[in-house]
Structures are given as C-alpha cells and as structure tokens.
C-alpha cells in the first residue's frame, strides 16, 4: 500500500479517492495500478468511452450526409491548399508520350520590382510573401521566366481550384460545337431526375456557364471549421455530389436575372458532360484537351468517391508547365482545343461579377484584352490577348 495526502484535506468531508465519510486525517491508503490510483483509470476509461461514442455518432452522421469519415474530413479541412489533391479520391487524366510537346526557351526576361502591401519589393520577395509555389511567363509560345519555390519543381502536381471551371468549359464548348448540346438546353432536360417543380427546372446551360442560374448555393462562407457546414463547403468534401445537388436545388433568384459567382453552376456542367458522353469528365478531358496539347505529365481530377463524379468546379490538378500548355493552346489556336466561336464566347464578357470584372462561359475578364482563369488560393492562368 502507498499513502497519498487527501485532496479534500478537511475532517468530515467526503474523500474523492477513498470515499471516507466519517473522519478524514488527510492521508489515504490506496493500492496503485502501476503508478496511478484506481480513480484515475476509471476516469480515463469513462473519457475513452465518451470519445468512442462521440466518434461513432460523427461517423454515422457523415454517412447520412455523405461526408468522409470524421478524421478524413478534419484532415481535408485543415490541410494546406497544395496538399488537398492527395486527400480525396481522383481519376487520372493521362498524358500520351506520342503527343508530348517539349517547351522551347525564349529570351530570358527579368521581372522588375513590384508594389506589394504598400511597399516596393523585389519580385523574388513578392513570390515568397505570397507563398507562391510556381510562376511562369510564356511569351510567343516560349518560356521566358520560370521559378519554383517551397520545394516544388517542374514535376510537382499543383491544385487549380477554380481554374478547373475553365477546363470544364472547354469540354462543354466542344460538345456545343458538335451539336450534342445547346446553350438553350435546360439542365433538367438532360438530367430529368433533378426536376424540382420550381424555377430550378428553367435553368439552362447558358445560365450555368455565365453564373446566372439563381440557384441558392452561395460561394461566400467563413474560412476554417466555422465554414464546414455551409453547402458549397459540403460539396467540396462530399462523397456523393448527386445526393448533394438533389438536396440543394432551392432557388434564390429567377434564372438569368441575377449573375453571381456560384460554384454549383460548374458542378452541374460536369454532370451534363458525363450524361451526354457516357464517360467521365476526366476521360473526356484526356482525349479532347490533355493529349492534344502535348501534356508531359498525368494530371488528376478529384472525385466524390472512387469511380464517381468529378468535382468539376474545383479539383483539377497538374504541373505548372502543363497548365501553361492549355493556356498557350487556347491563345494560339494550335493545337485546336476550342473553335473560333467558343474562343469568342470565352473572350466576350457576358455579365459583371465581383470587383466589376466581366465573366463569360467560366472565364474572367478583369481588364480589356485579358482572359483570366482564377483559383481560390491564388492560382492563375493569365492571358494577355490584346
């Protein structure tokens, strides 16, 4: 037996360790298990039981709302942007060695000092201050500047976030050119299982392309855990995007009347592609875009579950050089990944969104003569077409 001074320490009080109720001398005798009293182990056991019940409850909840299991969901929510592609299942977009087109180097150009946060700093310091992982300049089809930071390299797969929206639009544009769909087609005419009996049924492909559907799923939500319960954050982590859309068809405005940037629109375009072609968005993108531009590396597109649907609004991942190949092909017309008509559609602002910037068919227009593919965490494919 060992002795331990009473935590209560007063005569006549109930002792929490030995539960004496008559007279407490301030000293207890107890039989230790290892080096801890029985009460400590009881407390640990109770806490463990509570945690197991809590985890089981959360696990059951994630199954009901089609979310990853709790630990996976927390890892995804807290991960830095560059790590998220590996935390969700994905489909491969396969590069073809036979179509690989090596980059040529042009005359090297230096980037001058820039104004950032009210100060003039070197461009290298700017890249570091903005946590940039890769930066390239392509001029006249040749690389004139290329820099990698934070341990990244030419072969590093980087997430695009909403740059993926324009990638999805390129496939939609080809389907329109082929006469397989029209911009005037209603979404539910292609996927009738989503009919809601409301103005949702009037939403057209054009509405989706120009962020003008009126579907009430906002992209405005708090960062961090406080925003995880918001609808658009839910679809990012969802293990069943069809289930998610079925439960998020509420309309905020009439279609075509109130343009606002909402990622749900692009997700619906992705579902259209899979329904019309009978193939995954990844497979269509491989054949229509990736191999024709001569991509060097395989890319990935995150999906809701293995063999499921791509998250068309966000989750395309590739190397910096291969992103640049898509941008260069779209600008030069070689290889042809967009018809003249679709390039005009992409380049002609249809509505005004945030900051008064123009927007059309999943492409931003911040200034005249500029086409911009823009991702949430500072991903850009910036085209000066003037």
Where are these regions (language model features)?
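Cysteine-centered motifs
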Residues: 6, 15-18, 24
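N-terminal leader/targeting segments and the immediately adjacent pre-domain N-terminus
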Residues: 33-153, 181
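Active-site SXXK
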Residues: 141, 158-184, 208, 269-273, ...
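Flexible glycine/proline-enriched surface loops and loop-helix/loop-strand junctions
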Residues: 153-154, 249-255, 265-267, 305-312
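Active-site helix/loop module of the DD-peptidase/beta-lactamase fold
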Residues: 159, 177-216, 220, 250, ...
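Amphipathic alpha-helical interface segments
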Residues: 225-236, 247
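Conserved active-site loop region of the serine DD-peptidase/beta-lactamase
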Residues: 279-297, 309, 313-383
């Amino acid at each position: 037996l060992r002795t331990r001074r009473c935590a209560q320490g007063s005569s006549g009080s109930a002792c929490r360790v030995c539960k004496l109720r008559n007279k407490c001398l301030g000293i207890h005798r107890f039989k230790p298990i290892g080096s801890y009293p029985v009460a400590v182990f009881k407390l640990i056991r109770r806490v463990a039981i509570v945690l197991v019940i809590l985890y089981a409850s959360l696990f059951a909840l994630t199954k009901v709302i089609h979310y990853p299991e709790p630990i996976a969901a927390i890892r995804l929510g807290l991960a830095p942007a560059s790590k998220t592609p590996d935390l969700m299942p994905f489909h491969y977009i396969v590069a073809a060695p036979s179509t690989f087109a090596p980059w040529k180097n042009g005359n090297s150009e230096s980037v001058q000092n820039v104004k950032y946060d009210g100060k003039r700093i070197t461009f290298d310091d700017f890249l570091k201050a903005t946590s940039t992982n890769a930066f390239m300049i392509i001029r006249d089809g040749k690389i004139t500047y290329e820099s990698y930071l934070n341990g990244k390299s030419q072969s590093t797969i980087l997430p695009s976030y909403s740059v993926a929206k324009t990638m999805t639009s390129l496939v939609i544009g080809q389907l329109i050119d082929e006469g397989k769909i029209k911009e005037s087609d209603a979404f539910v005419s292609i996927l009738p299982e989503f009919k809601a009996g409301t103005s949702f049924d009037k939403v057209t492909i054009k509405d989706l392309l120009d962020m003008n559907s009126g579907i009430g799923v906002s992209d405005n939500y708090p960062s961090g855990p406080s925003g995880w319960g918001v609808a658009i954050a839910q679809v990012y982590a969802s293990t069943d995007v069809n289930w998610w859309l079925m439960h998020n068809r509420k309309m905020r405005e009439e279609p075509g009347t109130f343009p606002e940037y909402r990622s749900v629109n692009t997700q619906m375009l992705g579902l259209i592609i899979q329904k019309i072609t009978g193939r995954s968005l990844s497979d269509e993108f491989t054949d229509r875009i990736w191999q024709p531009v001569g991509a060097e590396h395989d890319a990935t597109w995150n999906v809701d579950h293995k063999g499921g649907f791509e998250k068309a609004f966000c989750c395309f991942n590739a190397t910096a050089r291969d992103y640049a190949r898509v941008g260069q092909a779209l600008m030069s017309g070689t290889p042809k990944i967009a018809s003249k008509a679709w390039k005009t559609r992409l380049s002609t602002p249809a509505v005004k969104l945030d900051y008064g910037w123009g927007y059309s068919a999943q492409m931003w227009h911040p200034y005249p003569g500029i086409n911009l593919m823009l991702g949430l965490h500072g991903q850009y494919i910036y085209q000066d077409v003037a």
